[in-house]
Amino acid sequence: MTGSNEFKLNQPPEDGISSVKFSPNTSQFLLVSSWDTSVRLYDVPANSMRLKYQHTGAVLDCAFYDPTHAWSGGLDHQLKMHDLNTDQENLVGTHDAPIRCVEYCPEVNVMATGSWDQTVKLWDPRTPCNAGTFSQPEKVYTLSVSGDRLIVGTAGRRVLVWDLRNMGYVQQRRESSLKYQTRCIRAFLNKQGYVLSSIEGRVAVEYLDPSPEVQKKKYAFKCHRLKENNIEQIYPVNAISFHNIHNTFATGGSDGFVNIWDPFNKKRLCQFHRYPTSIASLAFSNDGTTLAIASSYMYEMDDTEHPEDGIFIRQVTDAETKPKSPCT
């Protein structure tokens, strides 16, 4: 299954994989959260697990604050900060319901968490302590940082754009342009917009500038759909990750495929081989050379027999990730 440009990590989590995140400054270290209640740190080139720490419930997301500190949250409502050098942990705070998302906002130096308790909380990582709680209209399903803005996707297909420097009001209230439940949002690196995916095999490319001439550029497309016995099977698009150098992005779906897209020319650049089961999470390394792919059954068809969960590390090339110059 794996070629010379790809390998599977040893000692994978023992249950579903919820999130994979590369260290901010190296493709050597990968943080992985899991339903087995663990957060694991892998040394990728050595293909070994460096460290593991536990929550008391499934961990739904994790993030690096800096190269030596991991943050994580999940079903136990607890937000933890773990020092990866000393193996010391700190219970930073809690939500009133499971924590679904954990993200670092480097431009304003805060951690943001989104929860099913219908709030986003900001945390000062230096102290560490709570720096504010902000009500959302519904359960938070996904969030993404765009410079000093925070884009929050909730139940009810709502999207809220917050200014992290002034959280006194919501900067923009939007509705998803897709008809079905939002699964993932990731911001463009140029801070001009975001990509949103749904459970119904679609992806939308949206722009933050509300002016009509910019809004004309937005579009949506179908993906992660397979014809089987002349019937189109439609799969959730669970994961999105941007390539830091080329501004292209990868999507992962419950069909087990990873696609890479050029949003500027509206083209698919490539599709990798089919992975054993659903793609639950994706992460490009900061330098864009490596893609971590979590192949992990997400119980779309209830508790049936399924392939074991695994993390694949793939070396990617410019041919796979760089936009093609449009024909003139």
UniProtKB/Swiss-Prot annotation:
Covalent cross-link Glycyl lysine isopeptide (Lys-Gly) (interchain with G-Cter in ubiquitin) as placed by the record, residue numbers: 216
GO BP terms: cell division; chromosome segregation; meiotic cell cycle; regulation of chromosome segregation
Coiled coil: none
Modification after translation (UniProt): Poly-ADP-ribosylated by PARP1.
Main location: nucleus
Gene3D superfamilies per record: YVTN repeat-like/Quinoprotein amine dehydrogenase
Entry GO CC: kinetochore; nucleus
UniProt name for this protein: Mitotic checkpoint protein BUB3
Organism: Pongo abelii (Sumatran orangutan)
